[in-house]
Amino acid sequence: MGRVIGIDLGTTNSVMAVIEGGEPVVIPNAEGERLTPSVVAITPTGERLVGRFAKRQAITNPENTIYSIKRFMGRRFDDPEVQRTIKLVPYQVRRAQNGGVEVKMGDRWYTPQEISAMILQKLKQDAEAYLGETVDKAVITVPAYFDDSQRNATKDAGRIAGLEVLRIINEPTASALAYGLDKKGEEKVAVYDLGGGTYDISILDISEGVFQVLATNGDTHLGGDDFDQRIIDWLCDEFKRETGIDLRQDRMALQRLKEAAEKAKIELSSVQQTEINLPFITADATGPKHLVKTLTRSKLEQLVADLVEKTIPPMEQALKDAGLSPRDVDEVVLVGGQTRMPLIQRKVQEFFGKEPHKGINPDEVVAIGAAIQAGVLAGEVKEVLLLDVTPLTLAIETLGGVATPIIPRNTTIPTRKSQIFTTASDNQTQVEIHVVQGERPMAADNKTLGRFILDGIPPAPRGVPKIEVTFDIDANGILTVSARDLATGREQKITITASTGLTEEEIQRMIREAEEHAEEDRRKREAIELRNQAEALLYQAEKTLNEFSDRIPSELKLELENKMQAVREIVERDPMNTARLRPAYDELARTLSQVGARMYEQAGATASTGPDGGGRTSGAPGEETVEGEYREV
């Protein structure tokens, strides 16, 4: 059986962790780093890059570099937040056939699930290389405020990447697991999680290994990306005021601005001001233009003040739902890189009246919590019980378009609840069950999760038939709905899959493509390794020729030169063709080995024939040869 790892699949960065010797540890990626940028790209030569290498080339290849894909997961193209994000990214986005989102990379269109799967596939491969064994199962975290379709999309991404997703858990809950694993006694903990693209606030009760979520709230479209965008907008406005040039029209310039904005924001968490210096950002008839601006911490705080304020109402609502006041909270845990900003730390401290806990790494804590949950499921971690909640009310549409709640928000999961409904008109033989998620009183104002028909109801006056509707939420927060006519026992059941979700056929196709790409990646790695070995062998052969040319027999020297030329030609013209390079490499290695053997024979012959013709060497004339003394150490 393969290992189970915990994965924080983030908007900006992703992290993976595992239980080793009973303790959670972060797994470094192939580049030796603990954070993997959630970035995927196709280069002009058709090579696919994931992580740091994809992020590094984003400035020169903005249209084919996909980032912040989490903001599109499980969302409809018409969603106002999706439309807002489309205006800010340099890559192309279009409506998918099912009403969801597709992004263009290279000459192909991909779903957000496929892009996320590419990130997960890299994490899986790097974890396998680090652990030295197969990784085929994972616990993946999502924002607490992710709805049903976003959770399903995340699970699909895991399947495409070749991972069995044992559990989807909420990011703040995972953080609380990491924080409270060794804590004794009872504590009320608030987890304030502001990441690259999402914001969550969760209130938990932690007591002797039981982690119970009391309430959760948040905004799935508020995060560090929005803070970066405020800096980008300010730079564009300032540059336009000074030069008359609008940098928003230049995709390459925007990518440079994004990188500079993120860097400046990070620096201003530890210094009072920073210089943003972007030479040759653009050009006009008068020549090249340079952007040089000083950004102070106070100016940044002015630019983002309203974004920070947007995090306050969800905190108030979560506390209200939990039946607590700020002073009832014993500890506040900050999660997500954006919480390193001093303004956010001050605001949180003002709200709760206590300094936030700073003993955990906000970038890594979610993955560590996911690894703990993975350890619980694998039996490696004992005496830990996680009781999470559903973040949004689940309801069905009833007469007049009203959303009638079945499971209120912040209900502990897994859970199962039923309610009896009836027909709205005489002799009605079927009913449509319209399932929605959200807090609005009218069904049309909430998010549709799915619709299905229960038919075969015997004709009767309205109000007579009794139809039992049951909602069943599993531990992943994923919903199954069933409707049963109590008179006939006739039942209809669906697991809710979003209208923007993937069909089973699409998922299987994507799994095959991902496996094929993994095989292609393996062949590419082998080809690169062989090329490196060939270049090293060429260097060794050239060195041997240069140093010992006069001692190598002419026919062997000619053979060596020919074999070197054959390898050099393939390395220079067709280095990825292992079918040609492997035999040429083997031939060169064999010939070089023959050269070495011939030279060794010559050296042996020379050593055995001293100036006196004997095989024994002697000291200087008249001196006795002294036996060497050996002492055991």
From Swiss-Prot:
CDD domains assigned: ASKHA_NBD_HSP70_DnaK-like
Disulfide bonds listed in the record: none
Xref: Pfam families: HSP70 (PF00012)
Domain of life: Bacteria
Keyword terms of this UniProt record: ATP-binding, Chaperone, Nucleotide-binding, Phosphoprotein, Stress response
Entry function: Acts as a chaperone.
Protein name: Chaperone protein DnaK
